[in-house]
Amino acid sequence: MKKLLLTLVAFCAAFTAAAQTPDTTAAEGYRFTDVKLIPMTPVKDQSRSGTCWCYSTLSFLEGEILRAGGAPVHLSEMWIVRHTFMEKAVKYIRMHGEINFAEGGASRDVTEGIRNYGIVPFEAYPGFNYGTEKADFHELSRVLKAYLDAVMEASTKSSNKPLSTAWKRGFNAILDEYFGPMPETFTYQGKEYTPQTFAASLPIDIDDYIDISSFTHHPFYTQFIIEVPDNWMWGTVYNLPLDEMMAVVDNALENGYPVAWGTDVSEKGFSRTKAIGIVPAADLEGMGGTEAERWGKLTQKEKDDALYKFDKPGKELDITQEMRQVAFDNYETTDDHGMVIMGTATDQAGNHYYKVQNSWDVRPPYDGFWYFSRPFVAYKTTSVMVNKHAL
């Protein structure tokens, strides 16, 4: 019995020691240290809607309000989305359906929406008039598109009938039902406003915001209409060389200005679970001869599996102007998401990252924020919006 007891004690001691010994095979992971942070309003949730462009740009403007010394405010996303749907509908009908009518958009839609229609706080116009507490456009977008297509079908050349005078009223009635009637006046923090007077009360100037991009199919230092499906408004961007576009971003952040960021997250280097974006490259120089030879024999899938583990920092691609252009021309870079760059950070290896506020709710691992490497931002930026005073 004594011998058995001693054996059990020895086993338990060995087990405890093993449990306390670090697992040297465990993934190192990414460890970020924030360097520069710009104050922002809380992370929002676009939920089941393709309105990142609105959520991100309004968060960007809310950050600008804070920077200018204003009080925190949650601006109504659905106020802008609803007005934008109406303007999209008018252009869709005018173009005989030969233009994009969808949930997507761009930062310029928001600033022009405020210019034309004012803005209201979220409390005055939540815009969820269909039984949910968050945005859900699964039904709405289908209803709107079907209505517009029916209007056009009823007025084709073969029927020899003009558009009815009722179609805009009918479309607006649908918007009223889903978003709720728009207030002409409202009370906010004890004071009565109209959408226009509320916009005027904010310590920002809509004319201060400009869009910048970097592509070679248009001359540098000129403006051009960026050719992406969600640019239904045909908004223009200033075209700068890549290094100058990146300098604009860096200078803005260094001086306390957030940056509204249009980008592409349909990439293998974008991880939803790790909340990072990278452009990994094989470190061939760091490989021995046998290792390099073995790498060369791997299939593309095997190489991708090795590169996109997101287990620790590694070598990334050096992004060139030509690489950006090729990716844009062949559809590898698309305009599929908008966020706000609001800080900088480094990983444990000293690599530079941008800290980004997303609109996918507060979620792990960084409470709704993401980290994107400098190569990712250089490679996958479609456009940025900045305050012109940050240049």
Which sequence ranges carry the predicted segments?
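Extended low-complexity acidic/polar segments
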Residues: M1, A19, E98, A106-S107, ...
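Bacterial Sec-dependent N-terminal signal peptides
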Residues: M1-T21
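Residue-level detector of alpha-helical recognition elements and their boundaries
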Residues: L4, V9-A10, R67, M95, ...
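A broadly tuned, weak detector of single residues within folded domains
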Residues: L6-T7, C12, D45, S107, ...
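Long, low-complexity, compositionally biased intrinsically disordered regions
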Residues: Q20-E28
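Active-site signature of cysteine proteases
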Residues: T21-P22, T165, R169-L391
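Active-site nucleophile-adjacent alpha helix/oxyanion-hole segment immediately C-terminal to the catalytic cysteine
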Residues: A27-N231, G235-A260, Y354, P364-Y366
